[in-house]
Amino acid sequence: MHLTLEFGGGLELLLENSTKVHKVEVTTPKDGQGKVTMKFLLSWVKENLIKERPEMFLKADSVRPGVLVLINDCDWELCGGLDAELEEKDVVVFISTLHGG
């Protein structure tokens, strides 16, 4: 599944090369469901994109408080949160709202 992942508000600094936009291909889960959920995507991001301090992005199976998540410009909570199912060419944006001033 091809997805576009965008990171902002300082989260891009946790990734290799500090790149804000990543066009990725995520393989479907091997659990037989064949669906890519946000929970699966967060695990995939941790394993494949985060290069340092994953605790600044994730807490347990979800994002840390203060990280805004949008799926196709819609708050992920309105889409189902961790259970939201992603589709081909979706755009997922992660923005940290917590940063120094």
Swiss-Prot record:
Pfam families: Urm1. GO terms for biological process: protein urmylation; tRNA thio-modification; tRNA wobble uridine modification. CDD domains: Ubl_Urm1 (cd01764). The modification 1-thioglycine is found at residue 101. C-terminal thiocarboxylation occurs in 2 steps, it is first acyl-adenylated (-COAMP) via the hesA/moeB/thiF part of the MOCS3 homolog, then thiocarboxylated (-COSH) via the rhodanese domain of the MOCS3 homolog. It comes from the Eukaryota. One of its GO terms (molecular function) is protein tag activity. Its main location: cytoplasm. Keywords: Cytoplasm, Isopeptide bond, tRNA processing, Ubl conjugation pathway. Coiled coil: none annotated. GO terms for cellular component: cytosol; nucleus. SUPFAM superfamilies: MoaD/ThiS. InterPro entries: Beta-grasp_dom_sf, Mopterin_synth/thiamin_S_b, Urm1. It is found in: Cytoplasm. There is a cross-link at residue 101 (Glycyl lysine isopeptide (Gly-Lys) (interchain with K-? in acceptor proteins)). Pathway: tRNA modification; 5-methoxycarbonylmethyl-2-thiouridine-tRNA biosynthesis. Acts as a sulfur carrier required for 2-thiolation of mcm(5)S(2)U at tRNA wobble positions of cytosolic tRNA(Lys), tRNA(Glu) and tRNA(Gln). Serves as sulfur donor in tRNA 2-thiolation reaction by being thiocarboxylated (-COSH) at its C-terminus by MOCS3. The sulfur is then transferred to tRNA to form 2-thiolation of mcm(5)S(2)U. Also acts as a ubiquitin-like protein (UBL) that is covalently conjugated via an isopeptide bond to lysine residues of target proteins. Belongs to the URM1 family. HAMAP family: Urm1. This is Ubiquitin-related modifier 1 homolog. It comes from Zea mays. The gene is URM1.
